[in-house]
Swiss-Prot record:
The keyword Cell wall biogenesis/degradation applies. It comes from the Bacteria. Its main location: membrane. It comes from Psychrobacter arcticus (strain DSM 17307 / VKM B-2377 / 273-4). This is Phospho-N-acetylmuramoyl-pentapeptide-transferase. One of its GO terms (cellular component) is plasma membrane. Its EC number is 2.7.8.13. The gene is mraY. HAMAP family: MraY.
Length: 372
């Protein structure tokens, strides 16, 4: 929004034209979202307390977590508001990828909000009925897949259907999985569905300790932002052998907003947490990361960078599967972070060590760009 205003003002005073710079706008998006979170964070927490929107803690979880009962939840509303305001201010709003990401944020955020609200209303950590929850999450993921496919169909001068669909394989320069060989984009749409829903639920499962999920979200958003920058610049895309998709240039503004909003939220979510993001934050942030990975065609690199989220999700799948088949547990408790608590790690140790792993994984994911 402001990029057009400053562009017009630049006709009369040249320094205003600098705001059209993508890098500067990305930095301004970070600063705006961070400032928004810091300014309104305490007010949001007070309001959540006044509304008695306290977290319901599972009795079968770690006993040390029972002291967190009543800590305000649904703090993801603060994160999403900061992302929305910052993106609307600094992104070029004629870019369809920006709007797809904002719609994803709203859809998954609304599902998460309903889940959180039901947990609070009925004092039950189960929340929204699984069938209804996954129906709406599925609708959101299918919306992304269909939208991206038809953008490629209608505007082949921006991105071809082949570039949009085929899955890049890291390290191998010309190797791809040809989803474009499946008619009508069905292969691509189904794959997109699993990427986005998988990312959304994986981040949600990771959000179980103070600060654990939000910093890895920030780190992965930064990594994907770098990949969006490369993909949206014809010179870098050609040099690094990735598809050039012009719309990805503005995706970095959304990534910047996610970074700023996440860091601002971490200020209040660090141990001992004053607020939890809840499903409204975790489901939407995970879905946005998954969507950006699909937009940039870097799903495998995303799986590497978000390896912490992958490990948390796999730990739950293994635990449930093993218990159903063998009546035995693989871990003392799932998700994975609870297992380490059960073997004696303090909460702050688990969080700090998982953060270190997340940093390493993001660096490894970024290295795949050059290795191609």
């Amino acid at each position: 929004m402001l990029v057009w205003l400053f562009g017009w003002l630049g006709q009369y005073y040249a320094p205003f034209s600098a705001v059209s710079s993508l890098t500067l706008r990305a930095l301004l998006a970070v600063i705006t979202a961070l400032a928004f979170s810091m300014i309104f964070g305490s007010r949001v927490i007070r309001r959540l307390r006044a509304l008695k929107y306290g977290q319901a803690i599972r009795n079968d979880g770690p006993q040390s977590h029972l002291v967190k009962t009543g800590t305000p939840t649904m703090g993801g509303v603060l994160i999403l508001s900061a992302i929305g305001v910052s993106t609307l201010l600094w992104a070029r709003l004629n870019n369809p990828y920006v709007w797809i990401l904002l719609i994803v944020m709203i859809i998954f955020g609304a599902v998460g909000w309903a889940d959180d609200w039901l947990k609070i209303k009925y004092k039950n950590p189960k929340g929204l009925i699984a069938r209804k929850k996954y129906f709406w999450l599925s609708m959101g993921a299918l919306f992304v897949g269909i939208s991206l496919y038809y953008i490629a169909t209608l505007q082949p001068n921006v991105v071809t259907t082949r570039e949009m669909q085929d899955l890049l394989l890291p390290i191998f320069k010309d190797w791809m999985i040809p989803f474009s060989a499946v008619p009508f984009g069905i292969g691509f749409i189904i794959f997109t569905y699993f990427v986005i829903n998988g990312a959304s639920n994986a981040v949600n499962l990771t959000d179980g300790l103070d600060g654990l999920a939000i910093l890895p979200v920030v780190l992965v958003a930064a990594g994907l932002g770098a990949m969006a920058y490369v993909s949206g610049d014809v010179r870098f895309a050609d040099y690094l052998h990735v598809p050039y998709i012009a719309y990805n240039s503005e995706v970095i503004i959304v990534c910047g907003a996610m970074i700023g909003a996440g860091l601002g939220f971490l200020w209040f979510n660090a141990h001992p947490a004053q607020v939890f993001m809840g499903d409204v934050g975790a489901l939407s942030l995970g879905a946005m990361l998954g969507t950006i990975a699909v937009m940039t065609r870097q799903e495998i690199a995303f799986a590497i960078m978000g390896g912490l989220f992958v490990a948390e999700a796999l730990s739950v799948m293994l635990q449930v599967g093993s218990y159903k088949l063998r009546k035995k547990r693989v871990f003392r408790m799932a998700p994975l972070h609870h297992h380490f608590e059960e073997i004696g790690w303090k909460e702050t140790q688990v969080v700090a060590r998982f953060w270190i792993i997340a940093i390493i994984l993001v660096i490894l994911g970024l290295m795949t760009l050059k290795l191609r």
